[in-house]
From Swiss-Prot:
Lineage: Bacteria, Bacillati, Actinomycetota, Actinomycetes, Mycobacteriales
Name of the protein in question: DNA replication and repair protein RecF
PANTHER family hit by this protein: DNA REPLICATION AND REPAIR PROTEIN RECF
GO function terms (MF aspect): ATP binding; single-stranded DNA binding
Similarity remark: Belongs to the RecF family.
Organism from which the protein derives: Rhodococcus jostii (strain RHA1)
Encoding gene per record: recF
Length: 410
């Protein structure tokens, strides 16, 4: 798989960009803050419908405009598809495949597969569980695009059920203070909570089963990737931690366990059981305490948790290993995702640079950003684009320029 053409309009600092790309290695070179990462961010958004840098779409739309556009022509096994995405301020985003509008933007998922490693990925090791859940869900959706709908349904039910818990909790607190019977809204919330329990368990079981299967498939690739980056270090491992607690047998979260056909039904049953156990606590606190939104991916070096105990170098290696493991997993599925490396070589020592360069040489297409050409290993033999931002009366605008060394010669 490779991106043959990329076009941007009013995306971040780019008012307009049209690039023709080719397989192999391409490097975007320029000072920090001049728009290099925005190019990779746009491709990442077309791949995952999310940014690795911000949680909302608003910062992606260039200041002073109400709409951003990103489009890419993707070649996969000889088949060419063009995906376009409009990001609209205050309105729903719109997507097209080969100029034909889609019903929902998520229908473009799976056309472009990317694996991006960026400095922000250190949060996979040192950050909150939400960073690791997002990593799992993006990789899961890349493998199985229909899981995006499962996650969307789960999030919708979660919001509704959380609102009911707040209403029910408030009603019961008023009763406990002697202010009479629960309000009509409170009584209605209590009555319908069981129905929403069923919806949450049904969607949550599908999402949980998908994540567990993913961790099972990912674990050996993670161990191998970390070993290649840090052969003298302790072995790296991962394990899923579920909020279902004692309702879920411990062996269910063992990465070595082979997923079975009946897992979803079993997980749904255990999900309902744990919701029943936690009902009073959830109503008291007004939040949903059970489900994939409360789970985590545990990272270990030997017997020690990586978070809080790994050195800076070990944390970098673990974060990079998670991305490389995802890349290897997608390739084992028969895909060859676009590998994107955002200003990472400068952060790595010589051994890790060599190990990463070896992976990059084997990929069909690699897109790299670097502040200076010397940050990129020579063996990658890359095509280079210079990137520069200029201040204008329309704000700061990025441009493709001649390579930095060519300009200095002139």
């Amino acid at each position: 798989m490779f991106v043959r053409a990329l076009s941007l309009r009013d995306f971040r600092s780019w008012d307009a960009l049209g690039l023709t790309l080719r397989p192999g290695c391409t490097v975007f070179v320029g000072p920090n803050g001049h728009g290099k990462t925005n190019v990779l961010e746009a491709l990442g958004y077309l791949s995952t419908l999310s940014s690795h840098r911000v949680s909302s779409d608003a910062p992606l739309i260039r200041t002073g405009t109400g709409q951003a556009f990103a489009g890419a022509t993707v070649v996969n096994a000889g088949r060419e598809l063009t995906v376009d995405l409009e990001l609209n301020e205050g309105k729903s985003n719109r997507a097209r495949i080969n100029q034909s509008p889609t019903r929902r933007p998520r229908e473009i998922l799976g056309i472009l597969q990317t694996v991006l490693f960026a400095p922000e990925d250190l949060s996979l090791v040192r950050g909150d569980p939400g960073d690791r859940r997002r990593y799992l869900d993006e990789l899961l959706t890349s493998r199985i695009p229909r899981m995006a709908a499962v996650r969307a349904d789960y999030d919708r039910v979660l919001r509704q059920r959380s609102a009911l818990l707040k209403t029910a909790g408030g009603a019961l607190r008023r009763v406990s203070r002697g202010s009479g019977r629960p309000s009509e809204d409170g009584a209605s919330a209590l009555a319908t909570l069981e129905v929403w329990d069923g919806h949450l368990a049904a969607h949550g079981a599908q999402l949980l089963a998908g994540r567990l299967h993913l961790v099972h498939d990912l674990a050996p690739h993670l161990a191998e990737s970390y070993q290649s980056l840090a052969p003298e270090s302790r072995p790296a491992s991962i394990r899923y931690r579920s909020s279902l607690g004692s309702s879920l047998p411990p062996e269910f979260t063992e990465p070595a366990r082979v997923p079975e056909a009946g897992d979803i039904a079993f997980l749904e049953e255990r999900f309902l059981q744990e919701l029943s156990v936690m009902r009073s606590k959830e109503i008291e606190r007004g939040v949903c305490l059970v489900g994939p939104h409360r789970d985590d991916l545990e990272l270990h070096l030997g017997d020690t948790p990586a978070k809080g105990f790994a050195s800076h170098g070990e944390s970098w290696s673990f974060a990079l290993s998670l991305r490389l493991a995802g890349f290897a997993l997608l390739r084992s599925d028969g895909s060859d995702p676009v590998l994107m490396l955002d200003d990472v070589f400068a952060e790595l020592d010589r051994r890790r640079r060599r190990a990463l360069a070896k992976v990059a040489l084997d990929a069909e297409q690699v897109l790299i950003t670097a502040a200076v050409p010397e940050d990129v290993p020579e063996e990658l033999d890359a095509v280079r684009f210079g990137v520069e931002a200029r201040d204008t009366d329309r704000g700061r605008i990025s441009h493709i320029v001649e390579e930095p060394e060519d300009r200095s010669d002139g």
